[in-house]
Amino acid sequence: MHILKKPDFSDPKLRAKLAKGMGHNYYGEPAWPNDLLYIFPVVILGTFACLVGLAVLDPAMLGDKADPFATPLEILPEWYLYPVFQILRVVPNKLLGIVLQTLVPLGLMLIPFIENVNKYQNPFRRPIAMAFFLFGTMITIYLGIGACLPIDKSLTLGLF
């Protein structure tokens, strides 16, 4: 027995409704040509005009000229690479540092297999995954802060 009821096309009332076009979205403005020919180009040209206006009225300054003879004491990467930089800086063997970095995606791929019995999508009802992600976030923040400090204070964050 089917759960869903199939429409009876031999019903004259249903056939009359379908003949009038009811049940289809024929209301409102059509997308072609109103949106695609008129509204989209106006939005695109308006956005481009705003960008050009901002570039002319408030140009970005490039800063000081580079001096190749005055290098900083320690060159830092961009902020999003601080944890990776800290791992490579602290671990004595560089190959071990690269292996440690490959463990991160491998650990993320293992989470569904570790917690495969949990059917919930709510993160608060998935304690293993939540603990794993919170631990990873704390380690990433710790490594990122340590990368900003000198090498002798980077592991203790200058607290000890």
UniProtKB/Swiss-Prot annotation:
<keyword id="KW-1133">Transmembrane helix</keyword>
<dbReference type="Pfam" id="PF00032">
    <property type="entry name" value="Cytochrom_B_C"/>
</dbReference>
<keyword id="KW-0793">Thylakoid</keyword>
<protein>
    <recommendedName>
        <fullName>Cytochrome b6-f complex subunit 4</fullName>
    </recommendedName>
</protein>
<keyword id="KW-0602">Photosynthesis</keyword>
<dbReference type="InterPro" id="IPR005870">
    <property type="entry name" value="Cyt_b6/f_cplx_suIV"/>
</dbReference>
<dbReference type="GO" id="GO:0045156">
    <property type="term" value="F:electron transporter, transferring electrons within the cyclic electron transport pathway of photosynthesis activity"/>
</dbReference>
<keyword id="KW-0472">Membrane</keyword>
<comment type="subunit">
    <text>The 4 large subunits of the cytochrome b6-f complex are cytochrome b6, subunit IV (17 kDa polypeptide, PetD), cytochrome f and the Rieske protein, while the 4 small subunits are PetG, PetL, PetM and PetN. The complex functions as a dimer.</text>
</comment>
<dbReference type="InterPro" id="IPR005798">
    <property type="entry name" value="Cyt_b/b6_C"/>
</dbReference>
<keyword id="KW-0812">Transmembrane</keyword>
<dbReference type="GO" id="GO:0031676">
    <property type="term" value="C:plasma membrane-derived thylakoid membrane"/>
</dbReference>
<feature type="transmembrane region" description="Helical">
    <location>
        <begin position="95"/>
        <end position="115"/>
    </location>
</feature>
<dbReference type="GO" id="GO:0009767">
    <property type="term" value="P:photosynthetic electron transport chain"/>
</dbReference>
<comment type="function">
    <text>Component of the cytochrome b6-f complex, which mediates electron transfer between photosystem II (PSII) and photosystem I (PSI), cyclic electron flow around PSI, and state transitions.</text>
</comment>
<keyword id="KW-0813">Transport</keyword>
<dbReference type="GO" id="GO:0045158">
    <property type="term" value="F:electron transporter, transferring electrons within cytochrome b6/f complex of photosystem II activity"/>
</dbReference>
<feature type="transmembrane region" description="Helical">
    <location>
        <begin position="36"/>
        <end position="56"/>
    </location>
</feature>
<dbReference type="InterPro" id="IPR048260">
    <property type="entry name" value="Cytochrome_b_C_euk/bac"/>
</dbReference>
<comment type="similarity">
    <text>Belongs to the cytochrome b family. PetD subfamily.</text>
</comment>
<dbReference type="InterPro" id="IPR036150">
    <property type="entry name" value="Cyt_b/b6_C_sf"/>
</dbReference>
<feature type="transmembrane region" description="Helical">
    <location>
        <begin position="128"/>
        <end position="148"/>
    </location>
</feature>
<keyword id="KW-0249">Electron transport</keyword>
<dbReference type="GO" id="GO:0008121">
    <property type="term" value="F:ubiquinol-cytochrome-c reductase activity"/>
</dbReference>
